[in-house]
Design a protein with these regions (language model features):
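Non-catalytic C-terminal accessory region of glycerolipid acyltransferases
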Residues: 1-8, 48, 73, 77, ...
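A transmembrane-helix-recognition feature enriched in membrane-embedded lipid enzymes
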Residues: 1-15, 40, 44, 69
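Short linear elements at protein peripheries
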Residues: 13-30, 34
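Conserved beta-strand termini and adjacent loop/short-helix elements that scaffold enzyme active sites
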Residues: 15-17, 59, 81-84, 166, ...
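A generic local structural motif
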Residues: 15-19, 43, 91-93, 150
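Residues that cap or initiate secondary-structure elements
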Residues: 18-20, 37, 62, 112, ...
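Short amphipathic alpha-helical segments and helix-helix/interface helices
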Residues: 19-23, 68, 122-126
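Catalytic core of membrane glycerolipid acyltransferases/transacylases, capturing the structured
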Residues: 27-85, 145
Length: 205
């Protein structure tokens, strides 16, 4: 509840083009975002995709229990599996979620980094399920940067957050390391690493 109240103070903005991207309803999608943008992901689902439950991968170990509670606060459903090495079990579990018609959210640089280094898990799942990847971006007017490997962004109450997005269709997604680099470049383009006037960054369609 506290997280939702915090989010309610934020001035979330998105261009009409970005909103049209977010509300796409012809297929379940893979939402890809940097680990340090996780705080804002629940707002995407509540505002634009309320009929598409969003699932995220969490470690099956005992250490994953705290993450389940945190993800529930963000409005995410937990899929238990090996999030460290993105093993076969995790790929199958996430593919099943997409095939039954729900969305999944993945942080390609999580759960332990390095920051902004893309692992191939997101592209593997998207290619296997023939699902488009929504490259999700958030630009902050003012945010605290927490200590940690990802420099987690915590937007300050009553500040503006500008949401951005673009799709990489399944047919356009490269395989292996090329696909990982393709996704990394798209994420970097939509997520400025400095605090800016969020309205200056336009949606990339």
């Amino acid at each position: 509840m506290f997280v939702r109240l915090w989010n309610a103070t934020l001035r979330i903005q998105a261009s009409p083009a970005a909103e049209a991207i977010f509300v796409r309803h012809d297929t379940p999608i893979v939402v890809a975002l940097w680990h340090n943008r996780l705080f804002i992901i629940g707002d995407l689902g509540r505002r634009y995709r309320p009929d598409w439950p969003l699932h995220a991968l969490i470690s099956a170990s005992k250490d994953g229990a705290w993450a389940v509670a945190f993800f529930e606060l963000l409005g995410l459903n937990a899929v238990r599996g090996s999030s460290s090495n993105f093993g076969r079990e995790a790929i199958y579990a996430l593919t099943d979620v997409l095939r039954r018609g729900d969305d999944i959210g993945l942080t390609p640089d999580g759960p332990r980094g390095p920051r902004y280094a893309v692992k191939p898990g997101a592209t593997l799942v998207a290619r296997r399920a023939r699902a488009p990847i929504l490259v999700f971006g958030a630009a902050f007017e003012a945010a605290w940067k927490l200590r940690g490997w990802d420099a987690f962004r915590l937007p300050k109450p009553f500040s503006r957050v500008r949401l951005h997005g673009r799709y990489i269709e399944a047919d356009d997604l490269e395989s292996g390391e090329a696909g990982a680099e393709q996704l990394r470049e798209a994420l970097l383009a939509l997520n400025p690493d400095v605090e800016i006037d969020p309205t200056r960054l336009e949606c990339v369609v």
